[in-house]
Amino acid sequence: MEAAPSEKVPAKKLSSSENLDIGVSEVVTVDAAENNSNGIKRGLKTRHVSMMALAGIIGPGVFIGMGSALHIGGPVGLIVGFAIVSIVVFGVMLSIGEFNSLFDFNFNTHAARWVDPAFGAAIGWNYVIVWLTNIAAEYTSLTSILQYWGPHVPSYGFFLIFWGFFTCYQMLGVSVFGESEYILAFIKLLFITGFYIFAIIYAAGGIPHHKPPNLFKEMPLAHGFGGIVSAFVYAGVFFSGVESVSMTAAESKNPKKAIPLAVRQTFWRILYVYFGISISYGITVAWNDPNLSSGSKTLKSPMTIAIMNAGWNHAGDFVNAVILITCLSSINSGIYIGSRSLYNLAKDGMAPKIFKRVDKRGVPWVAVHSVHLFGFLSIMNYSTGAVKAYGYIINLAGVSAFIVWTAIIFVHFRFRRGWVKQGYALSDLPFKSPLYPFPQLIGFVIGIILTLVQGWTVFKPFAAGDFVDAYILLPLFFVIWLSYKFIKKTKWVSYEDMDFINGRRVIEPTYSNEQSSDKETEDGKKTSFWNRVWKEV
């Protein structure tokens, strides 16, 4: 049950004694409505949201784009670049967990409430840009993979086929989307695990008639500090999606349970996926392998290169098939998140009202089709080559991600200060960020540094086109912020005026005889032993 956004309702604060009597962990969300007040439907289960947090960080970039990052940064540069960016991501996820366990809004709405509506508009539009460019990048990957099998078919032919498919598929509703992402994420996880096993055998000399080189010893850094900086941008793009749990909150059946669970699991998934894959690539593929820097329109995955170098020439077909599945999953997620971001902007009056239109299935169809149209940007690889086009798009998406992440952490600082100043207890928060404010402070500082230095390589020698590509979104953020502020006459929100009431989920105490077992799902069904293990990791 939620307070309508347009209504002012009195805040109900639990006293310290009440908190001691019932326990903070025993507060549950009263939210049984199938549709929320926005018109979209609650069709995502806890397992969907949890898996989407995983699926969001296993995109085609893991299989394809990291080949470019390896070529630029070398094996050590790749690991260092992703390690630094992961610190920012962890701080962002803790902030989102605290927001969305209490309010099922997206972060541009949070920013509008607790900083400035104009600041919220700037964050929201930058996040839309993240996903517009991501969709184009994923289509570039998809068409490149398909050209591995059909080199004589033009890339735009493959693009048009799948563009038509996703145009129809996205209209089936959020429950279909959630179930498909759950299955695809599981397939990706299995495949990555299999490759880790292969990499260990390969590096240990377990492949007959093959002596692997010590790549970490022979060539740890490909291009010095510049290579590490370039790896930052790739990391920013490949990590894009972990914050998508903020988008799924409004369509989750139990956000209070689903969001904190997804946030807690993020650290281990980042460690397993990105550090695992960085090490695996570093010990199986040389940074100067000619296939990584090929100017052809077909991008080859380091996985494909590694397995073919091991002597399994036809294994590349299997690897490409799995990468194809990953591309389909990422495009599916990109359209979903991008369209919901645009829908939320329209709902908050920060985008044209037409994007608020929702069909009977709860799908914001105008936003879906508008966002999906930007997939046509991928067609430019027909003239520039997939590698070059992918690089252009990656830069735009990476810078947008850094800006949005840094802004989210800043909003969290404001939220915490206002929450305490208005007399609320931290124990009233369904999910409280551990070690606050240290993860956020570290992430905030690193986020600012990454935003400023990610285009460092364009200065030596100076390249005007690359400079614009690397930094154009930074001034654009301030242009949107100041333009909206001037047109709408918005004001900086003081701590005393922050709204912690409207839209806040109503919580009620659950006493011991009413508590549901941890061995039950949100539907009241018993969970298996393996599902409970999965929740812990």
From Swiss-Prot:
Localisation per UniProt entry: Membrane
Principal localisation: membrane
Transmembrane residue ranges: 52-72, 76-96, 157-177, 183-203, 219-239, 267-287, 318-338, 362-382, 393-413, 462-482
Keywords (A to Z) from UniProt: Amino-acid transport, Membrane, Transmembrane, Transmembrane helix, Transport
Pfam families, A to Z: AA_permease (PF00324)
Disulfide feature: none
Membrane-topology annotation of the record: Multi-pass membrane protein
GO biological process, one term: amino acid transmembrane transport
GO cellular component: Golgi apparatus; membrane; plasma membrane
Listed InterPro entries: AA-permease/SLC12A_dom, APC_YAT
Single annotated GO MF: L-leucine transmembrane transporter activity
Family listed: Belongs to the amino acid-polyamine-organocation (APC) superfamily.
PANTHER family noted in UniProt: AMINO ACID PERMEASE (PTHR43341), GENERAL AMINO ACID PERMEASE AGP3 (PTHR43341:SF26)
Protein name: Uncharacterized amino-acid permease C965.11c
Organism: Schizosaccharomyces pombe (strain 972 / ATCC 24843)
